[in-house]
Design a protein with these regions (language model features):
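Membrane-interface helix-loop junctions in multi-pass transporters/channels
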Residues: 1-123
Length: 123
């Protein structure tokens, strides 16, 4: 049952990431892959926040922690899509855009993870 929960959580996270990506394209935000950026930023915040809350505030089991952090957030965030997007930008003649996207993604992702941890520690 534990493995099924991880699979379902991962699938749910992946589906939400896909829908987010489609929504950003439908909004006309095609200059950068904003769906991946938003998913990674939200996911980084949530992993910072939930990794603290699940253990220290809510006292959840290790299994629940794995389902939420590895399953759901692992499916929701994506480093592989980010990597492919960067390479595609560079190969399509936009190396500066690719480098800027790396800087934005990494810097903001670290900041969001830290913000999530800080918020959780204050509660």
């Amino acid at each position: 049952m534990f493995y099924i929960a991880i699979i379902l959580a991962g699938g749910t996270g992946a589906l939400l990431r896909h829908l987010l990506g489609r929504a950003t394209v439908n909004l006309g935000w095609a200059a950068l892959p904003f769906g991946t950026l938003i998913a990674n930023l939200v996911g980084c915040f949530l992993i910072g926040y939930l990794s603290w809350m699940l253990v220290y505030k809510w006292h959840m089991s290790k299994e629940i922690q794995i389902v939420v952090l590895t399953g759901f957030l692992g499916g929701f965030t994506t480093f592989s899509a980010f990597s492919l997007e960067v390479i595609s930008m560079a190969e399509e003649g936009s190396p500066i855009k690719a480098i800027a996207y790396v800087g934005i993604q990494v810097t903001l992702s670290l900041m969001m993870c830290f913000a999530g941890l800080l918020l959780a520690r204050q509660l």
